[in-house]
Design a protein with these regions (language model features):
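N-terminal export/assembly segments and adjacent metallocofactor-ligating motifs
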Residues: 1-239, 276, 390
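Non-catalytic alpha/beta scaffold blocks inside enzyme catalytic domains
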Residues: 37, 139-313, 320-326, 334, ...
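Generic structural signal for short, solvent-exposed loop/turn connectors between secondary structure elements
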Residues: 25-30, 57, 65-74, 94-96, ...
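Active-site-adjacent alpha/beta core region of enzyme catalytic domains
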Residues: 331
Length: 479
C-alpha cells in the first residue's frame, strides 16, 4: 500500500466547477471532498461531484481501443485503430469532405482543449458538418446574442452580489446549479440576495425548489414566456420608463421594439399566460423600483417553444430598463483576453454556411442536432456517411432515438470516443477510450476562462491526479 496524499483539483461535471480535495492512494482517487478553502466555490460540491471517482473506477470502463468484428467488439492497438480509421476517412473525404460529420457533446465543453482540437480536426478535413448538444438546450442564447450584440458568446449575467430584484424564468438553479454563469452553492447565494433585502420572483409553471427558497412564485402557462415578456416591455414603454440615456449611442431599433410591444398589453395576454394583468403590473413596479434588477433565464426557456425570441425579449427587458452592464443588473464579464475581438478577427463562430437539410444557418460553428439523422439518411451530394461522436451520447439524449439509431446503422464509419461503451458506442465501428477528468491536466472551460462568466472571479488549474488505468488518451491528443 502506498502512502495516501491529498491534492487540490476542481470538478468538471457542470458550470459550477466546484473546488475539490482529492485523496490519492496507489494511483487511485479514493475520496473527494469539498474544498472548504476555495475562494470561488465556498466549500460546496454536489453528490455527483463527490462520487465521480467511483464511476471512473468501474470495471466497465473502456481500457483499450475497440473494433467491431461482426456482432462483437475486439480490442486493438492504437496504431491499428488510427491507421484503419484514417484510411476510411481518406476514402470518404476523397468523395466529399462534407460526407464526414462530428457530434460534440456537453462533456467536451468541460475540457479546455477537447473542443478546440475536435473543431480543428474537422476544419482540417474541410467539413462544416458539426453538430452539438447545445442545440437541444441553449442555442437560443447564442442565436439571440448574435443578433442583439453581434457575437454569440456575448452573454451578460446577473450581478448576484448587488441585484435587488431578480426575475427567474425557466430555470431552477437550486437543483441544476446555474447556467451561463459559474455559481457554486446556489441556495446560499440566493439567500444572500434575500438577506440584504432583495426580492427573487420565480416565474414558472411549477412551484420549483428555487421558488421555495425565493419565497415568491408567479405561475405561468408553459410556452407563453414570449407573451409575458412582450407585455412586460409594453408596460415599461407605456410608463415612459425606458432608460433611453443608458442606451444612447449603443443601441438601435428602440422605436421598432416599442411598436411591436404596443400590441401586447397585459390585459390582452393575461388569458394566454395565466398571469393576471394586475400581477404583471406589480412585477414591473417591483422591477423598475429596484436599484439593480435582472431577468434570469435558463434551459426551460431554451427548450421551450420560441426560445430564441423569448431570450431576445428577456435581454431587451434588461437593456431597456437600464440594467444592462450595470451594477446590480447584468454584467459583461472579461476573460483572460479579448475573446470576442479574437474571434471576429479570425472569423470564428460567425460563418454563414447553410445546412444541406433545412437550409439552417450555422451557429457557433455547428448545425442543429435535430437534422443530423436526416443528413445521414437523405441521399444526395454531401450526404453524411462517416461520423465522429465525442463527449456525448446522442442516441440517448437526442429526440427520436429510433430514427437516430436507423441513421447510425447506415453509416460507413462511426467512431465514438468515450469512457464507456454507451448506447451510441454500441453501434460504432471503432470505440476509442478517453481519459476521465481526473486523469488529465486542465483549466476551466471557455465561459469562465475566456469570457469571465463568474459570480466570484478567480482562475484555477489542475494537474492530472492519477495516470490512466489502461490505454486511455485525452481527446485533444486523439484529434
Amino acid at each position: 500500500m502506498g502512502k495516501a496524499r491529498t491534492t487540490h483539483t476542481f470538478c468538471r461535471i457542470c458550470e459550477a466547477s466546484c473546488g475539490l480535495v482529492a485523496t490519492v492512494e496507489d494511483q487511485r482517487v479514493t475520496a473527494l471532498e469539498p474544498d472548504k478553502q476555495h475562494h470561488g466555490t465556498l466549500g460546496f460540491s454536489c453528490m455527483k461531484g463527490l462520487h465521480q471517482h467511483s464511476m471512473y473506477d468501474s470495471p466497465d470502463r473502456l481500457q483499450t481501443p475497440m473494433k467491431r468484428v461482426g456482432d462483437r467488439f475486439e480490442p486493438i492497438s492504437w496504431s491499428q485503430a488510427l491507421s484503419e480509421i484514417g484510411a476510411r476517412v481518406k476514402s470518404l473525404r476523397a468523395v466529399s469532405p462534407q460526407s464526414l460529420g462530428m457530434y460534440v457533446g456537453t462533456a467536451a465543453g468541460f475540457s479546455i482543449l477537447h473542443p478546440i482540437f475536435a473543431e480543428g480536426f474537422m476544419q482540417g478535413l474541410g467539413s462544416r458538418n458539426i453538430y452539438s448538444s447545445s442545440t437541444q438546450d441553449c442555442a437560443n442564447r447564442f442565436a439571440a446574442a448574435r443578433e442583439m450584440y453581434g457575437f454569440p458568446f456575448f452573454q451578460p449575467f446577473v450581478d448576484l452580489d448587488h441585484v435587488e430584484c431578480m426575475l427567474i424564468v425557466g430555470t431552477n438553479p437550486v437543483v441544476s446549479k446555474w447556467t451561463f454563469l459559474q455559481v457554486a452553492h446556489p441556495v446560499k447565494r440566493l439567500k444572500q440576495v434575500k438577506h440584504r433585502g432583495g426580492r427573487i420572483i420565480v416565474v414558472d409553471p411549477r412551484y420549483t425548489e428555487t421558488a421555495k427558497v425565493a419565497g415568491e412564485h408567479c405561475y405561468i402557462k408553459p410556452n407563453t414566456d414570449v407573451f409575458f415578456f412582450l407585455s412586460f416591455l409594453e408596460e415599461i414603454f407605456s410608463r415612459d420608463a425606458a432608460d433611453a440615456p443608458h442606451l444612447q449611442g449603443k443601441a438601435s431599433g428602440m422605436d421598432a421594439l416599442r411598436e411591436v410591444t404596443r400590441h401586447w398589453p397585459a390585459d390582452r395576454t393575461a388569458e394566454v399566460t395565466g398571469i393576471p394583468a394586475d400581477t404583471l403590473r406589480d412585477l414591473v413596479n417591483t422591477f423598475l423600483a429596484a436599484d439593480g434588477a435582472a431577468v434570469v433565464t435558463g434551459t426551460g426557456l431554451g427548450m421551450g417553444k420560441d426560445g430564441t425570441l423569448a431570450q431576445w425579449l428577456a435581454e431587451c427587458i434588461n437593456a431597456v430598463s437600464g440594467n444592462l452592464d450595470k451594477r446590480g443588473g447584468t454584467l459583461v464579464g472579461e476573460g483572460i483576453f479579448d475573446f470576442a475581438g479574437f474571434a471576429r478577427k479570425n472569423g470564428m463562430f460567425m460563418r454563414k454556411a447553410r445546412s444541406r437539410i433545412g437550409d439552417f444557418r450555422e451557429l457557433n460553428g455547428g448545425f442543429p442536432g435535430g437534422i443530423l439523422a436526416d443528413e445521414i439518411l437523405t441521399p444526395g451530394q454531401d450526404q453524411i456517411k462517416g461520423m465522429f461522436v465525442t463527449g456525448g451520447n446522442p442516441l440517448l439524449t437526442m429526440a427520436n432515438a429510433d430514427r437516430m439509431r436507423e441513421a447510425f446503422k447506415q453509416l460507413e464509419l462511426l467512431v465514438v470516443t468515450d469512457i464507456y461503451l454507451n448506447e451510441t458506442a454500441s453501434l460504432a465501428h471503432y470505440v476509442l477510450p478517453a481519459t476521465s477528468p481526473l486523469e488529465r491536466p486542465d483549466l476551466p472551460f471557455v465561459f469562465p476562462l475566456f469570457l469571465g462568466m463568474q459570480s466570484i472571479p478567480y482562475l484555477a488549474a489542475t494537474e492530472a491526479l492519477v495516470k490512466p488505468s489502461g490505454e486511455q488518451r485525452d481527446e485533444a491528443s486523439i484529434y
